[in-house]
Amino acid sequence: MGLAAEQAGLSRQPLADRVNGKNILCGLAAGQAIHSAFAAQAEIKGSPNFLTGRFGLNAIFAGGNADLEKGLADLGKKFSVTETSIKLYPSCRSTHPGLDLTFDMMADEPDLANRVDTIEVTSSKIVNELVGSPFKPGKDPRVAAQFSIPYTLSVALKRGKIALSDFD
């Protein structure tokens, strides 16, 4: 059921649950966009009221109170694809600022790893909930490590880099 929900694109819960299903979220969304474009080209009709209808997304997710005018103001004008990027590290994006800072400090002080006993990271509540807990391998150690500031910063300090193989 969890994989079915992830394919519907309705939840980011796999991130919180630390399951590898999170790895397919973006690909599934992109695939559905392509399927939808082909379906539209074949004149298959989707609901015109998918946002505003009684059972539309506004009703389901915002209790009918979403500001759709504001939300749709840039539709067809602004294309977010220009705001995307390739992640520099094979871990949750929320670990990246800490990794950037660690690598910057190591560039200035190459022996930093030998002098550090503890690292204190301050972040927003949501980032802390997502990646700030002590590292616990759990049922899926790879995903747990990818969503752990303690793990990723420790690896960065010890190895001077972080690579996909650090999560095997």
Task: Label the model's feature ranges.
Residues 1-13:
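Conserved catalytic cysteine-centered active-site region
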Residues 14-17, 21-31, 38-168:
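Terminal-appendage/accessory-domain detector
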Residues 2, 35-38:
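A broadly conserved amphipathic alpha-helix scaffold signal in soluble, globular proteins
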